[in-house]
UniProtKB/Swiss-Prot annotation:
The gene is rpsM. Residues 91-121 are annotated as: Disordered. The keyword Cell division does not apply. Keywords: Ribonucleoprotein, Ribosomal protein, RNA-binding, rRNA-binding, tRNA-binding. This is Small ribosomal subunit protein uS13. Part of the 30S ribosomal subunit. Forms a loose heterodimer with protein S19. Forms two bridges to the 50S subunit in the 70S ribosome. PROSITE patterns: RIBOSOMAL_S13_1 (PS00646), RIBOSOMAL_S13_2 (PS50159). Residues 100-121 have a biased composition (Basic residues).
Length: 121
């Protein structure tokens, strides 16, 4: 089983798709990595040779992925909250950050409805 950046890639998937299981690598970046390393994107992970896995591992080390990327994003959110800007306050209150309306809708961000007594008209 191929293990890259601490993630076990699914054996029966194509390499191009399996690389997207790594946090921080999407389809476009996976295609770029495969083009740079010269690995066939249509081959299955179980059919990869050790040399190919080493090439992929070396190519992914140049990117910020997995734990480092999660930590970096978390620190960016924490910085916004610490400086007290509008985006940081909206993140802290679990409200939409980018100017969407909240009188109605915004259910994904705000969570399920909380019934308030006496709100019936």
């Amino acid at each position: 089983m191929a293990r890259i950046a601490g993630i076990d890639l699914p054996r029966d998937k194509r390499v191009e798709i399996a690389l997207t299981y790594i946090y921080g690598i999407g389809l476009t970046r996976a295609q770029n990595i495969l083009a740079k390393t010269g690995v066939n994107p249509d081959i299955r992970v179980k059919d990869l040779e050790d040399g190919d896995v080493q090439k992929l591992r070396a190519a992914t080390e140049s990117f910020t992925i997995e734990g480092d990327l999660r930590r970096q994003e978390g620190m960016a959110l924490k910085r916004l909250q610490d400086i007290g800007c509008l985006r940081g306050r909206r993140h802290r209150m679990s409200l939409p950050v980018r100017g969407q309306r909240t009188r109605t809708n915004a259910r994904t961000r705000r969570g399920s409805r909380k019934t308030v007594a006496g709100r019936k008209k």
